[in-house]
Amino acid sequence: MENTENSVDAKSFKNAETKILHGSKSMDSGMSFDNSYKMDYPEMGLCIIINNKNFHKSTGMAPRSGTDVDAANLRETFTNLKYEVRNKNDLTCEEILELMNSVSKEDHSKRSSFVCVLLSHGDEGIIFGTNGPVDLRKVTGFFRGDYCRSLTGKPKLFIIQACRGTELDCGIETDSGIEDDMACQKIPVEADFLYAYSTAPGYYSWRNSKDGSWFIQSLCAMLKLYAHKLEFMHILTRVNRKVATEFESFSLDSAFHGKKQIPCIVSMLTKELYLYH
């Protein structure tokens, strides 16, 4: 692997960033007695990619070099999975919330699922618009079951490439079909969400200026290999392993050299998810 510098997606890693290696209409739910989500709707669904690269001077945050590689890789990957991909670049906090509100009010009744990818600086529980922080729960809350009715019972995937703190991982060496009958069923409003974070709580998330972030590189690679073979959680487990074992930071600053990363999956899915039918 070529040694180009890596950066982190933290809210305020100003100087080292460049030094380091380098609701909707009537409910048409996906609920059924089956153990896997119904994915044979006319459309796979929307994939919204928010790619924040440049930030207002007042934030003190450096540009996220390499993020355009991630955005292009994601667009190709999810287009091949038959999603309708919409790329949005350099959105403010207000624009992010306006976009999520607008998308949640679309009619998703003919769509099997929903995907949103957030590429930005971050910290625990927040993502950064170009002008400051926004609470992740506000971003995702528009798609709760009590707000976005036409996605109730359907998988809602949020993929988040951003730091979740300022800790560094030094690593350690080792040796080693019946929908109508379910239409009135009450389910938790937070059900059927999945959050795929690029890193564990509290930690930096690494990004390479040439190849993009470790997490998005790995996610796209595993989806290309296994999206038509494996259940989604199994794919994410392979993503975890790839990031954990195949990447290590290269930095001119010894404090940031030789560091590791492990993605984190938070699932409230209630069924198995196969991105094909």
UniProtKB/Swiss-Prot annotation:
GO biological process: apoptotic process; erythrocyte differentiation; execution phase of apoptosis; intrinsic apoptotic signaling pathway in response to osmotic stress; keratinocyte differentiation; neuron differentiation; positive regulation of amyloid-beta formation; positive regulation of apoptotic process
Alphabetical list of CDD domains matching this protein: CASc
Modified residues (N-acetylmethionine): M1
Reaction catalyzed: Strict requirement for an Asp residue at positions P1 and P4. It has a preferred cleavage sequence of Asp-Xaa-Xaa-Asp-|- with a hydrophobic amino-acid residue at P2 and a hydrophilic amino-acid residue at P3, although Val or Ala are also accepted at this position
GO molecular function: cysteine-type endopeptidase activity; endopeptidase activity; enzyme activator activity
UniProt KW Repressor keyword: no
PANTHER family: CASPASE, CASPASE-3
This protein's name: Caspase-3
Organism in which the protein naturally occurs: Canis lupus familiaris (Dog)
Upper taxonomic lineage: Eukaryota, Metazoa, Chordata, Craniata, Vertebrata
